[in-house]
Amino acid sequence: MLAYISGVGGNARQVFYRSPNLTMLKVCFPNGRRTPPHDHGTWATILLLSGEEKNTLYRRENGRLRRVGEVTLTRGEILPMPTETVHVAECLGGKPTIGLHVYGGDIMGEVPRHMWDPQTLAEHALDWNTYETFAQAASQAPSAP
């Protein structure tokens, strides 16, 4: 049986597999949705199944985030992210994106994760209620921070 989780802002995650060492999700972002900067607390790999997704990549330096690049994925493309990666994911192209996300741990449970306020770039421990507030603010901004 697959668990299906829907977010307030329209994100949807379908759990394919979850264990202490590995999580596999199908993730759907609605058109125009942008996440706040966040990490996964472990390595992550995204395989884009449909749509177009821009990922803005950051590195932590001296307690701050520094933008280090952008990668735009289209159907069939893969983005591997090492544990230290911080990124913003953004749905482009006028239709939802759907991706297979694979993580090296239980990111829905025990793995400590972080997020950043998209307006101030202040770091916070990830909690889903605040994450949704940050995602709404990020989606209304003209671009990723």
Predicted features and spans:
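Short acidic-glycine-tyrosine-enriched beta hairpin
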Residues: 60-87, 121-128
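A short glycine-rich, His/Asp/Glu-containing loop-to-beta-strand
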Residues: 2-31, 75
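Short beta-strand His + acidic residue motifs that chelate non-heme Fe in jelly-roll/DSBH
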Residues: 36-38, 55-56, 81, 87-93
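Conserved short histidine dyad/triad with adjacent acidic residue
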Residues: 25-39, 73-74, 82-84
